[in-house]
């Protein structure tokens, strides 16, 4: 760009150019006037760029600090004042038309930052009107009138050519001053509620000044003088089309392009969220805290926040470096050593929404049991298969974990090599509860989308194999093996601590507050599955978690009574005579399962292991308490009556069995089978 020949000298900027800054102090305006004067000298002489850039960073940080005092108006005024500053830079660059204009980073990037602030203000203002109605927030009438004029000006700037973007600067800042005066008057007269103020603050998130400084620093240090050197996205174009708007003769589009795409800026609520009332649950707290400190608790839930790393710190912040070591020591003292690198869960140290999960447990040196899986805690399948998620097992002799594994839904692992083997089940094509043979948890839900794992675990006290310091539910269990979710000091886990599960506090608290219907504390940990990441650690040895799984299968046709008796006697005979294949499988616990054979769909099939016979009997007894009580009374009356002969007793019991009524000869399993058949035929 060649300088103008008819211009003998370039006049310096006049003091009235800085009068349009809204809400700024006199000292800041004087500092800004000196900044624009230095900018004028840099464009003419092409020197002094380093001093100017350092002063530019100081002015931007001072503007951000001054705008924080206005609370609800902080983001709105900061964005508008930055728009005014970049507008001045662009106007003086075009006015002087200096040969070395683009050597200055502020002159080179003035047009781009002006576009950025204009589109950002337009999107925020458009969402101010749309989300206000959807969130049932009625803003004051006078304030909405001024904001509507503000939106009209922004739409014209975004629709028109970007060459005339810097025009009308004073008129634009006059509308901003009207909004500032109206809002201040309403707040002084208590005509605007805290919820309305918080909504205005949420609608206009402040711009990250540190991001602007980082971009300018990169352009300055790398000596970029052409925008083609920057890694920028491809320019979006819209194809002209014939519509009703073309009848007016205007070659432009009525809707700005920024409103047609997803403009997900930092701190701005996602474009597909219309109701913002969940973000305004505590308006007083929102007004009393910093914007990004409050909105960070909604990270990933409608808002995207990232912490900018300062690449340049001005000289005004250099003396504060001596205080940094002391601040780091204080942060290390207040950190939670048991939660950052815990044995079972790693808790985030910063969580403004929920706090740290360590508050739900004992002190840092104590252990906390989140879930315990003993052999007496039966996993009952409800509306799908039952699965055991990633667990960590702890032994009695050592506090370090010995195994990390994932148990499939229908697979039953043996507690030790001396337990009774179980009859291998055959899979059918029509079986609703299919067995996931692969141990990979990620592939299981994809192949079986209907098999949602819902788990109910019952807390237990310390026993021979697990010795925690705190348990959720006190009960006496001896001689059992199990696995538990553990939280303890970092030295409890050897090896790498980089990949340790993270659990949400709100999710954990909601799980711990659930109560079962049978009187005992039942904790549904199925909701913890989405937020639990498996511990990546080598297993020293395999520790089994014995479980009892009940498979329910509908009966299509009634079967005679001898078949039912044979059905329940067969698992007991199979358990007493283990097969050579099961013995070989016990010796090699890590062997892959054999392919299952196909069989036809049969009647009700209730199979369990011999060692879990008492557990299943107790579960079924709780399902039918009245019938069980009647059987006990009949059994007591039968013992007192002492029948004359067994033949007479059989003659009396025979008709009752033939009539279909419950008698004392039916055990709890036959009673359960009878009830299922009755409900099926009904």
UniProtKB/Swiss-Prot annotation:
It comes from Equine herpesvirus 2 (strain 86/87) (EHV-2). This is Putative transcription activator BRLF1 homolog. Residues 396-470, 558-667 are annotated as: Disordered. Transcription activation. The keyword Transcription regulation applies. GO terms for molecular function: DNA binding. Keywords: Activator, DNA-binding, Early protein, Transcription, Transcription regulation. The gene is 50. It comes from the Viruses. Pfam families: Herpes_TAF50 (PF03326). The keyword 4Fe-4S does not apply. Residues 420-434 have a biased composition (Basic residues).
């Amino acid at each position: 760009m060649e300088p103008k020949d008819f211009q003998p000298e370039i006049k310096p900027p006049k003091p009235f150019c800085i009068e349009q800054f809204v809400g700024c102090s006199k000292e800041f305006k004087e500092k800004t006037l000196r900044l624009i004067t230095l900018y004028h000298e840099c464009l003419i002489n092409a020197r002094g760029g380093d001093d100017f850039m350092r002063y530019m960073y100081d002015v931007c940080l001072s503007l951000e600090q001054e705008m924080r005092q206005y609370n609800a108006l902080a983001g709105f005024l900061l964005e508008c004042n930055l728009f005014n500053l970049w507008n001045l830079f662009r106007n003086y660059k075009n006015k002087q038309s200096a040969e070395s204009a683009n050597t200055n980073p502020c002159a080179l990037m003035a047009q781009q930052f002006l576009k950025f602030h204009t589109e950002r203000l337009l999107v925020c203002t458009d969402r101010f009107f749309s989300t206000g109605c959807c969130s049932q927030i009625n803003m004051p009438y006078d304030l909405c009138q001024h904001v509507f004029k503000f939106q009209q000006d922004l739409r014209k700037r975004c629709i028109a050519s970007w060459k005339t973007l810097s025009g009308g600067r004073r008129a634009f800042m006059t509308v901003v001053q009207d909004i500032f005066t109206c809002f201040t008057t309403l707040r002084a007269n208590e005509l605007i509620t805290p919820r309305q103020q918080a909504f205005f603050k949420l609608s206009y998130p402040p711009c990250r000044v540190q991001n602007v400084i980082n971009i300018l620093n990169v352009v300055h240090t790398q000596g970029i003088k052409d925008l083609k050197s920057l890694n920028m996205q491809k320019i979006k174009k819209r194809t002209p089309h014939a519509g009703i708007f073309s009848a007016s003769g205007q070659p432009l589009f009525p809707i700005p392009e920024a409103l047609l795409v997803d403009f997900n800026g930092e701190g701005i609520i996602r474009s597909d969220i219309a109701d913002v009332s969940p973000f305004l649950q505590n308006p007083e707290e929102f007004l009393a805290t910093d914007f990004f400190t409050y909105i960070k608790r909604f990270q990933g839930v409608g808002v995207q926040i990232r912490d900018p790393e300062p690449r340049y710190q001005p000289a005004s912040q250099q003396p504060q470096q001596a205080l940094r070591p002391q601040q780091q020591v204080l942060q290390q003292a207040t950190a939670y050593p048991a939660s950052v690198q815990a044995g079972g869960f790693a808790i985030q140290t910063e969580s403004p929404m929920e706090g740290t999960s360590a508050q739900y447990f004992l002190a840092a040196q104590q252990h906390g049991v989140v879930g315990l899986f003993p052999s007496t805690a039966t996993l009952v399948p409800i509306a799908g298969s039952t699965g055991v998620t990633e667990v960590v097992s702890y032994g009695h002799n050592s506090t370090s974990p010995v195994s990390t594994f994932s148990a499939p839904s229908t697979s039953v692992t043996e507690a030790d090599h001396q337990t009774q083997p179980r009859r291998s089940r055959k899979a059918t094509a029509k079986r609703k509860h299919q067995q996931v043979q692969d141990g990979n948890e990620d592939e299981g839900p994809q192949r079986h989308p209907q098999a949602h794992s819902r788990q109910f675990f019952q807390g237990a006290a310390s026993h021979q194999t697990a010795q925690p310091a705190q348990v959720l539910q006190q009960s006496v269990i001896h001689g059992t093996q199990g696995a538990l979710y553990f939280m303890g000091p970092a030295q409890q886990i050897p090896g790498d601590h980089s990949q340790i599960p993270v659990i949400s506090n709100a999710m954990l608290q909601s799980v711990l507050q659930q109560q079962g219907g049978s009187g005992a504390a039942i904790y549904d940990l199925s909701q913890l599955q989405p937020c639990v990441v498996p511990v990546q650690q080598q297993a020293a040895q395999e520790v089994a978690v014995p479980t009892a799984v009940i498979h329910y299968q509908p009966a299509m046709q009634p079967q005679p009574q001898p078949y039912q008796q044979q059905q329940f006697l067969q698992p007991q005979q199979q358990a007493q005579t283990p097969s050579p294949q099961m013995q070989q499988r016990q010796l090699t616990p890590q062997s892959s399962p054999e392919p299952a054979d196909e069989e036809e769909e049969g009647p009700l099939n209730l199979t369990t292991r011999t060692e879990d016979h008492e557990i299943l009997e107790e579960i079924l007894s709780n399902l039918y308490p009245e019938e069980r009580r009647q059987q006990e009374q009949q059994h007591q009356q039968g013992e007192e009556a002492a029948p004359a002969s067994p033949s007479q007793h059989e003659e009396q019991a025979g008709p009752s069995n033939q009539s279909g009524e419950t008698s004392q000869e039916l055990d709890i399993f036959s009673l359960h089978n009878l009830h299922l058949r009755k409900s099926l035929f009904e």
